[in-house]
Design a protein with these regions (language model features):
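Structural helix-boundary/capping segments
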Residues: 1-38
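Domain-scale detector for complete catalytic domains at protein termini or as standalone homologs
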Residues: 38-40, 48, 97-99
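Anionic-ligand-binding alpha/beta catalytic cores of soluble enzymes and soluble regulatory domains
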Residues: 42-55
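Short Gly/aromatic-enriched secondary-structure transition segments
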Residues: 57-74
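C-terminal edge-of-domain segments
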Residues: 132-171
Length: 171
């Protein structure tokens, strides 16, 4: 039951700005439903762009019964770039030691057995590496090969992909 509730919750959140049931309360004010996973057999993955809740590739996490654990930020030293010629649009997170940090990420937890099929879907220049979070924890997460940021727009100042998308959308 817990796994099914978690999948339903993640799917509901991935649909965007929906209300909670028949109320006018936004879904985001409700805490996420967590699946009961064995921490010894699960992997925490930080996502930063098209895999965030409500974004086009979030379904790849939901299909693997991943559970949203929290939204947090990276440690200092990271920069975020809007990569050119990606579909759907994607950011690239790069550690260069100079970034102010504080890039928004979501931490998802998935069973070890689902991790390989998830990683196999990630196209270059993106990949999975170890990220340091603002509180000092380390998790696996999306990183970008440094050559891909040549000519890419540095969007670090926005603090995250969602904020950049919101600012770049015409009103």
């Amino acid at each position: 039951d817990g796994m099914l509730a978690s999948v339903g919750d993640a799917l509901h959140r991935s649909l965007g700005d929906l209300k909670l049931g028949a109320t006018s309360s936004p879904l985001s004010s409700a805490p996420p439903v967590f699946a009961e996973m064995n921490p010894a057999n699960s992997i925490k993955v930080a996502v930063v762009g098209a895999h965030l809740s409500g974004q086009p590739l979030n379904v790849q996490l939901v299909e693997r019964n991943a559970a949203l654990i929290e939204t947090t930020r990276t440690a200092a030293g990271y920069r975020l770039y809007a990569l050119a010629n990606t579909s759907p649009p994607k950011p690239g997170l790069v550690f260069d030691g100079t970034g102010p940090g504080g890039i928004e990420v979501e931490i998802w937890e998935m069973e070890e057995g689902a991790f390989g099929s998830f990683v196999a879907l990630i196209p270059a220049p993106l990949g999975i590496g170890t990220l340091t979070l603002a509180d000092g924890r380390t998790v696996q997460g999306f990183l970008c090969e440094s050559h891909a940021i040549r000519g890419a727009e540095d969007i670090t100042e926005f603090g995250g992909w969602r904020a950049w998308l919101a600012r770049s959308t015409p009103t």
